[in-house]
């Protein structure tokens, strides 16, 4: 019999899951009864999300992880494996704290640019290397949270758009490399109501009208119901034949993929 979401127990880890889309993914996976590890710097916030996972029928855990610190991702993966004995999915959602801040390239110093690269790509490199053997054993998957900015570009968000486009290329290349070992690699380009999006709207008040005007559904996605459940599908066995794909979960805002 073909397995479906809810009939399988998965062990997954989500970076940057103390709020926004990361939290939404954690809660959606909790709905399926999965074991969800919240990998984050802030223990109090991470434990709070883990408690929400428990309340929804999943198994919530916090593991200390600062993706910006070399070795931290590997330590987090090792901790999870020591307690669970397996790992089925890794979600890299963490992003630079500078991501929602619109700024012209002339004002972007090298340190700020490197911060984007370090969190979006350097941490991804570390997570992928640290988790590969476990994902190979479970025939699991790696899921990256990218952005429509990586497809079409965004004025005054060039560092963010640049690393998000690079993430997509990384995912497609890794899908080809890891496919022979049964490991899937996919991406999601979300558009959701999150604290980061709200901050961006505060910095650019006209942005909200622009975003909704180009959205056929005229709304922002819900971090759990829309983005989280799409992520859960890609992490599940129901998506066992899906790899190297970027799923646009943006209400049709960026149709030209």
Which residues does each PLM region occupy?
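Conserved glycine-rich cofactor-binding loop
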Residues: 18-20, 42
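Catalytic Tyr-x(3-8)-Lys segment
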Residues: 205-225
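Catalytic Tyr-X3-Lys loop
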Residues: 106-125, 143, 167
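Conserved mid-core segment of classical short-chain dehydrogenase/reductases
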Residues: 96-114, 156-159, 199-203
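Short, small/polar-rich loop/turn modules that mediate ligand/substrate recognition or access, typified
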Residues: 179, 184, 242-244
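Short C-terminal tail/terminal secondary-structure segment
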Residues: 2-4, 102, 152, 232, ...
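Catalytic loop of short-chain dehydrogenase/reductase
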Residues: 96-97, 110, 141-167, 171-180, ...
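Amphipathic alpha-helical dimer-interface segment in Rossmann-like NAD(P)H-dependent oxidoreductases
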Residues: 78, 119-137, 175-176, 236
